[in-house]
Design a protein with these regions (language model features):
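Walker A/P-loop
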Residues: 71-95
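Conserved C-terminal RecA-like helicase domain
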Residues: 79, 83, 137-195, 199-200, ...
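Conserved ATPase-coupling elements of RecA-like P-loop NTPase cores
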Residues: 121, 192-201, 216, 227-239, ...
Length: 544
């Protein structure tokens, strides 16, 4: 199976053209070091006029309150708001090619919030069909060299070398006019560890002995993906500004951070746009047929358990919980690492991962304050089983329709968010994976039901292959998987993060049925990772 990209879509062209026109008739000095971007005259008055003129176009959909004529400053910041699923990654890739073609910009750093998004971005840029699209369909006479900054394991004795990805990015030369250099980095690597800040490497790059300094010398353009995770008071954003000092930051996202302006009675909270060039919001995206609508089913607990948990007090890294039943109240003082099963067996698998001066953080990502309370009902095994069964039923309803589409069959995926990794992966011996085992039993039962229906030969074969190997139908991705040595786990992670084409195929490379279509995660895939073939999403337990 080969994916195809469509060119000339107006909702994407508007964004690319807007960014490109910002630099129109701005002085750009090309006489710089071979490893550096051309120098943009950020003091040019043309920026103000160009930006304001773009914002006034009706097609850009920029609200009057976000149109401005403020000066640029030391870094030009441009904002593109695009709803999830409308092609942000494609648009910023297209923008990279266009800025290189028009202005010779060839050094871009893409900052993303997570390892999952970093992997997805790298995979997209390296795909053969993507390269062919920009070269053959759009006619760009250039190719992107993709570097991915990875965390390094503790180095043993010996010579200390610059991170390979940093070296390749910095040393990339403008003299090679058909090369564009892109470095992808997740936010944690900008702020943790000493990889980019240390200056005791044995070999320098272009005279620089500190990676951040070497990167700064390239005068990079920085693209920020998911800007709401890079607010101005966040460490990663501060590192981008102070350590990389980019000439230009282009933020692409469906959601932008909030900021407070004004004082006293005039104080208000607004979206933190700097120079918003394009606003493709949810309403416009849906009305234009660019995104799918969502049908939500709220599943009511079926158990008769009438219990609540209330947080009475939080202090000194401990929290006092009260377990309330119809007949009694019992208080327990818990600390980080304790299981809430101490309160009720229905809460097995839910632990405390953090306690601050005013809130308790649970392993499902929920944050609870003093006096907060929640029902125990939604944690019962019967509730989980009912939700799983309904999600599986809904999946097969959609899968049957998509498999027999007149315009060509579509592989249907389902995504399950869970909050207890142990329930899916099991312990070190693979035991106690109760949720995974429950899912397999329910899937097996539903497959047998589907096989009893009238099926086309092709779909019947697909269902039988699924029934013959239930484990092959599912895969999980959790943050802990990045260090898991198990080959089967690595294959699951690769299928979800890297092998998008194979995941969407009905047949694997060996010519056998590819039945993997049920994906499990905690919240690792909650943003940035997207797949148009996900038709069913189930949030198990109370995950916030």
């Amino acid at each position: 199976m080969e994916l195809k990209l469509e060119s000339g879509l107006p909702h994407q062209e508007y964004a690319v053209e807007a960014i490109s026109e910002v630099f129109k008739q701005v002085e750009i000095n090309q006489q710089v070091a071979h490893y550096s971007n051309p120098v943009i005259d950020l003091r040019s008055n043309r920026f103000i006029g160009n930006i304001y003129r773009i914002q006034q176009r009706e097609r850009q959909n920029v609200a009057e309150k976000y149109r401005n004529e403020q000066p640029v400053g030391n870094t030009l910041c441009l904002d593109i708001k695009m709803e999830t699923g409308t092609g942000k990654t494609y648009v910023y890739t297209h923008t990279i090619f266009e800025l290189h073609k028009r202005y010779g910009i060839n050094k871009f750093i893409i900052a993303v919030p997570s390892i999952a998004i970093k992997a997805g971005t790298s995979t997209f840029l390296n795909e053969t069909y993507v390269k062919a699209h920009f070269k053959n369909t759009l006619g760009y006479d250039a190719e992107i060299n993709v570097g991915v900054l990875e965390a390094v394991k503790k180095q043993k004795k010996g010579r200390k070398y610059f991170p390979t990805a940093v070296r390749a990015f910095v040393e990339g030369s403008r003299l090679n006019r058909n090369k564009i250099y892109v470095l992808i980095v997740n936010s944690a690597l900008l702020t943790t560890g000493k990889m980019l800040t240390r200056n005791d490497y044995d070999v320098t790059i272009e005279g620089y002995d500190r990676p951040f300094d070497a990167l700064r010398s390239t005068r990079p353009f920085v693209i920020i993906d998911e800007p709401h995770t890079f607010s101005r008071d966040q460490k990663a954003y501060k590192a981008i500004i102070s350590e990389l000092t980019p000439q230009c930051i282009i933020r692409f996202g469906a959601t932008f951070p909030m900021t407070t302006i004004g004082k006293g009675k005039k104080k208000t909270t607004v979206r933190d746009y700097e120079h918003l060039l394009y606003d493709l919001n949810a309403q416009r995206s849906f009305s234009s047929g660019l995104i799918k609508g969502v049908m939500k089913e709220h599943f009511e607990p079926t158990s008769t358990i009438n219990e609540k948990v209330k947080i009475l007090d939080i202090n000194d890294k401990k929290a006092t919980f009260q377990h309330i039943t119809q007949t009694s109240k019992a208080s327990h003082v818990l600390s980080v690492g304790d299981s809430l099963s101490i309160l009720s067996p229905e809460l097995t698998g839910l632990t405390i991962t953090g306690i601050t001066k005013d809130l308790v953080i649970l392993s499902n990502g929920m944050e609870k304050h003093k006096k907060d309370e929640f029902d125990v009902d939604i944690y019962t095994s019967s509730y989980q089983e009912s939700m799983l069964r309904l999600a599986i039923q809904r999946h097969f309803e959609t899968e049957r329709d998509n498999f027999h589409r007149e315009k060509g069959r579509i592989k249907t995926l389902a995504l399950f968010f869970i909050d207890d990794i142990l329930s899916f992966r099991g312990d070190d011996e693979g035991n106690n994976a109760w949720l995974r085992d429950l899912f397999d039993r329910l899937l097996e039962a539903q497959l047998k039901t589907e096989l009893q229906k009238e099926n086309s030969p092709g779909y019947a074969t697909y269902l039988r292959a699924s029934l013959n190997d239930l484990a092959a139908c599912r895969a999980g991705y959790f943050a802990q998987d990045n260090s898991d040595p198990d080959d089967a786990v690595k294959k699951e992670v690769d299928d979800i993060l890297h092998n998008k084409t194979e995941l969407l195929s009905f047949v694997n490379k060996k010519g056998q049925p590819n039945t993997r279509r049920f994906l499990f995660s905690k919240w690792t895939l909650k943003e940035g990772w997207d797949n148009p073939n996900v038709f069913t999403i189930a949030k198990l337990r109370s995950s916030g």
